[in-house]
C-alpha cells in the first residue's frame, strides 16, 4: 500500500506519531516516479536535491505547533506556474531554457504551508489543448491505460496524482484544463471562482479566464489544498477581496434539502450515453440522501465553444506577443535583422496549436473584424453568465457530466482540431461565467476509463460544491479505485 493512498489528515497523524517522516514521503514520490515515469511522462523537471533538503529541514520540525497546513506533503506544480530557480517552460520550446527569478503567489503559499515541491508537470503547450499531445517535448499518457490520453491541458498534473507519483498537484483551468483531465484520470479537480486564487506568476494564456486550482485523490485533500492557496493578493488586481471560508469544516456530508439543477443541454446532443447514465445514477445517489433535482436550461451554452475560442485566442495573441527572443527564452540563430529575430524565434519556438490560436486571435482583433467577432463574443459571454445567474436564483448547484465521453485514444483526434475542441463543451461555459466547478469520479465507460461528475456552484461558493462532492464521494466507492499501472 502506497503512503499516497492515505489522506492529508491521515498522513499528518502518522507524522505526528513518528510512524513516518517527511523524507519517507519524498522518497516514496521519487521511487514511484522512477518506477512509472518512463511510461506516464507526467513530469518535465524534477527538483530532487532541493526536495530532499527540504524534507530533512521539515523532519526536524515534526510535531511543532506552528507547522503549516500541508506540512510535509509532496506536490507537483504545473509547468506554467513560475518557480524561483526551477525551470518553467510551459511545455514550449520557446521557453526551454527559462529559469524564473521569483515564485508565483501560489508557490509562496505552498512553501508557507510547508509542502515539498517534487517537480514541474507536463502540459499542453501554453495550456492550449485537451489531450497533452500538444506538449513541445513529449506527451503524457493516462495511467489507467497508456494507449489513452490523460486530458489537457493539465494532463501531467492529473496523471501524476492518478499514478501515485505525488499526493496532489496544481493545475490551471482556462476552459476545462483542470476538470477534464481530472475526469479522464479518475481524480478530483477544482476550478475555483475567478479571482479566488491569485494568478500572479501564472504564465497567461487568456487572462480573463485562467484560474489555478488543485488536483487530488479525494475531495477532502482538495479542500486542504484550496484552503492553502486561496485569498486576495496585492500582486494580482483580479484577485478578489472575498472572505475565504473554512472548506474543511464544510465537509459535513449533509445534502438534505439541496436543490440541484440539471441543464438539458448537458445531457443532450453530443453527450455520450455512458456520461449521461453516470450522471443520472449520481443524481439517484444524491436523491437518496435528501437532495432534489429538476431539469433546467442554459440556452446560450450552444454558443459557448465559439465564444470561448474567439475570446481566449484573442487574449492569447496579445499575451504571447511578449515571447519574441529579445528578453528571455530561446532565440533563433537564423537572424539577419530585428524582424528576422521576431519571426524566426516565434516560428521555431511555438508549436502548431499555439500558432493556430495566435492567428485566430489576431484575426478576431484586427481592424474591420473586431466588432463582428471579439465584441460580439463578449456580448454572448454576458448572456452565458446571465443564464447561470438565472438558474442560481432558484437552485444551489448545477450538475452534469464533466466531459461528453471518457478519455480517447492517443492520436485519435490530434489531426482534427474541431473534434478535439468539442471535448470541452461542458466545461467552457463555467469559465466564461467565472463560477467554480469541481469534477469527481462517478463511474467508468465500456473501455474501463473513468468518468467525471461536474458540480457547479455560485460565485465564491466553493464550500457548497465541496459539501456536495464530498457527500457523493463518501456514498460511493469510485474514489477508492486506482489505476493499475
Swiss-Prot record:
Identify the catalytic residues: 78 (charge relay system), 153 (charge relay system), 177 (acyl-ester intermediate)
The EC number on file is: 6.3.5.7
SUPFAM superfamilies according to UniProt: Amidase signature (AS) enzymes (SSF75304)
Pfam families named in the record: Amidase
One annotated Gene Ontology cellular component of this protein: glutamyl-tRNA(Gln) amidotransferase complex
User: In which family does this protein belong, per the annotation?
Assistant: Belongs to the amidase family. GatA subfamily.
Q: What does this protein do?
A: Allows the formation of correctly charged Gln-tRNA(Gln) through the transamidation of misacylated Glu-tRNA(Gln) in organisms which lack glutaminyl-tRNA synthetase. The reaction takes place in the presence of glutamine and ATP through an activated gamma-phospho-Glu-tRNA(Gln).
Know the name of this protein? Glutamyl-tRNA(Gln) amidotransferase subunit A
- What lineage is on file? Bacteria, Bacillati, Bacillota, Bacilli, Bacillales
